Amino acid sequence: MLTHLDSQGRAHMVDVTDKSVTFREAVAEARVRMLPETLKMIVDGAHPKGDVFAVARIAGIQAAKKTSDLIPLCHPLMLTGVKVELSADGADSVHIVARCKLSGQTGVEMEALTAASVAALTIYDMCKAVDRGMTIESIRLLEKLGGKSGHFKADQA
């Protein structure tokens, strides 16, 4: 059942008024593949635009907080924690992991996915002048905790 459609098939924001407040957490990931030279420049802190990981981390955090402005039927949430981690993965990619949490009436999957996506887009934006062939890959939900549907873990789905 698609919860964002009413009985006439029209889109609407789901009413969560009667749902219980529970702890909710979601973890999402993304990956940016690039030339090894581009990754080395980032890791060595030699990028002319500055600290790529720091800017991408802040962009991801800000994006999580703005998710309801970007995704029309998402509820505005009072996030209590957002963490975005970036790391070099092998010789040619950056791995991004975003974690969002709150105590609330609806989940934070979209916030975690948005954080990971925007962090990846920020890396692309900052590095496109030196590497136009970068690819953003594997944006996915890794884990979801809390709420009526319970625990989801990607490797166990």
Curated annotation (Swiss-Prot):
Which InterPro entries does the annotation name? MoaC (IPR023045), MoaC_bact/euk (IPR047594), MoaC_sf (IPR036522), MoCo_biosynth_MoaA/MoaC (IPR050105), Mopterin_CF_biosynth-C_dom (IPR002820)
Catalytic machinery residues:
D125
Name any one GO molecular function: cyclic pyranopterin monophosphate synthase activity
Annotated Gene3D superfamilies: Molybdopterin cofactor biosynthesis C (MoaC) domain
Q: Give the top-level enzyme category.
A: lyase
Q: Does the keyword Cytoplasm apply?
A: no
Q: Which UniProt keywords apply?
A: Lyase, Molybdenum cofactor biosynthesis
Q: What is its EC number?
A: 4.6.1.17
Per the record, the pathway is: Cofactor biosynthesis; molybdopterin biosynthesis
Return one Gene Ontology term, BP aspect: Mo-molybdopterin cofactor biosynthetic process
Which residues lie in coiled coils?
A: none
Where substrate binds, per the record, is at L73, C74, H75, M110, E111
Summary of the function given for this chain in its UniProt record: Catalyzes the conversion of (8S)-3',8-cyclo-7,8-dihydroguanosine 5'-triphosphate to cyclic pyranopterin monophosphate (cPMP).
Q: Which family does it belong to?
A: Belongs to the MoaC family.
**Subunit comment:** Homohexamer; trimer of dimers.
Its recorded name reads Cyclic pyranopterin monophosphate synthase
Look up and give the organism this protein is from. Answer: Pseudomonas fluorescens (strain SBW25)
Q: What is the lineage of its organism?
A: Bacteria, Pseudomonadati, Pseudomonadota, Gammaproteobacteria, Pseudomonadales
